[in-house]
Each structure stands twice: as structure tokens, then as C-alpha cells.
Amino acid sequence: MNTLLELYRHKTWATLRLIEYCLSLDPPHLDANMAGTYGTIPDTLRHVVEAEEDYFSVLTGERLPEPFPAGLVRLEELAQRLRRLAPHWEVLALDTDLPGHTVTFPDGVSWPGAVLLAQAIHHAADHRTHILSLLGARGVEVPRLDVWAYAQSAGLQVA
């Protein structure tokens, strides 16, 4: 078992599960906003997925074939984009050389690959928490997205 790989699988699983959950929400919940969070749920999820694609591009030097569309993006499309990217993140998570490579953002700022790998995990978790906090404050029961829930769903629990 590879720890970084499981962290990336959890990141993808939790974000996809949250998107799927949000598809069942009424517009007043989706369009709500709360101080201390990024914005509405669709705006926050777009930000998460767009950042995933940007982080991937910086780490690999590859531009994704489909640029992120301008304007409103449906939740279903965000989920599709994450599903397409997930196997590529898994390859990166298994690349033992990547953490030590220097990666450079378009603005010229450089970091070790390990920093960007960690940031991608943290960023997604941070914004998922924003969404869960927003929904919880509105009295909406939220899905479990923790590592325990992921491990159970992935069949990782040992008898």
C-alpha cells in the first residue's frame, strides 16, 4: 500500500462524493454563501477542480486538452473533469522522483514537487470543509468524507 496514492484516491473520492451529494440539493442551498468560505457551492467546487487541473499542469508541464470553460460550469461537468484527471494524479503519486523535482508556476515562483503534491491535497480538503460547514450551518445533514469513510468504501478495512 502506498500512503501518497491513498491520500490522492481519498481526495478524488471525497470531492466526487461531495459533488454527487450536491447534485441533490435545492438551489437555495447551492447558492448560499457564508463569511469565511470561498463562495457559493458551485463556485467553490469549480475553484477546487480548476485548481486540480492547474496543479497537475504545473507538476507535469502539460496543458490539459480541454481548457477550463469560462462562466458557469455544471456540477456534472466538474465531476467528469475530476474523473478524467484522477488516473493521472495516481501516476504522479507513485512517481518517487517527483517530490524532489523543482516545479515552476507561470508567475515564475518555484517549489519542490512535494510542496505542490501536499498543497493539492490540502486545498481540496480545505474547500470541501467550507462546503460542509456552510451546509451544516443551514441545518443540512452532510455526507461523511473523512478517510475512514473512504477506506470503508474502498474495502481497505481489515477484518
Predicted features and spans:
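Short, contiguous alpha-helical
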Residues: 5-67, 107-159
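Helix-adjacent hinge/juxtasegments
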Residues: 61-99
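A short coil-to-beta-strand element that immediately follows conserved catalytic motifs
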Residues: 96-102, 142-143
